Amino acid sequence: MSRIGKRPITIPNKVTVNIDGSHVAVKGPKGELQRTLPTLVIVEQDEGVLRVVRQDDSRTARQRHGLCRTLVSNMVEGVSKGFEKRLEIQGVGYRAAAQGSKLTLNVGYSKPVEMDMPSGIGVAVEKNTEITITGIDKEIVGNVAAKIRAVRPPEPYKGKGIRYKGEVVRRKAGKTGKK
């Protein structure tokens, strides 16, 4: 029983949803998203509400039920509000700079690391150490944030590196030298 899959999705004003078989297109003030959903799941629309219904009670259909409901819900939320991920850089001399759709990271390597952002993704840098990634597709925003963090993940001894805002890094005690 998928409790997530049973919950209806309310469609906000200014958002239109077109359903063509297993293909769902959502259009809103921030942009347009399209996705082809897996089989065994049907999306139904009536009076400002979307419902995701599975075709049978097979194990695969039950697995995909909650997944598809969340995917469609994220599409609706993305085109109406958008998504954002925040990262922070810690370390002496570590900094970031954004120019257009290009992000430059100086994080302790011999040369700066330059990253191009995919289309539809905005990047902003505040105070040289806080990076904000915005976009309408939650999956792409999360992947871009993970790739930026992977350039220099936080290390457990001094805590230097790139981390998500609010992420707690487990610290380790250094080795004790013998005297």
UniProtKB/Swiss-Prot annotation:
- A Gene Ontology BP annotation from the UniProt entry: cytoplasmic translation
One function term, GO molecular function aspect: rRNA binding
Q: Does the keyword Nuclease apply?
A: no
Q: What InterPro entries has UniProt attached to this entry?
A: Ribosomal_uL6-like, Ribosomal_uL6-like_a/b-dom_sf, Ribosomal_uL6_a/b-dom, Ribosomal_uL6_bac-type, Ribosomal_uL6_CS
Question: Gene Ontology cellular component?
Answer: cytosolic large ribosomal subunit
Free-text function comment from the UniProt entry: This protein binds to the 23S rRNA, and is important in its secondary structure. It is located near the subunit interface in the base of the L7/L12 stalk, and near the tRNA binding site of the peptidyltransferase center.
Write down what this protein is called: Large ribosomal subunit protein uL6
Q: What gene is it encoded by? A: rplF
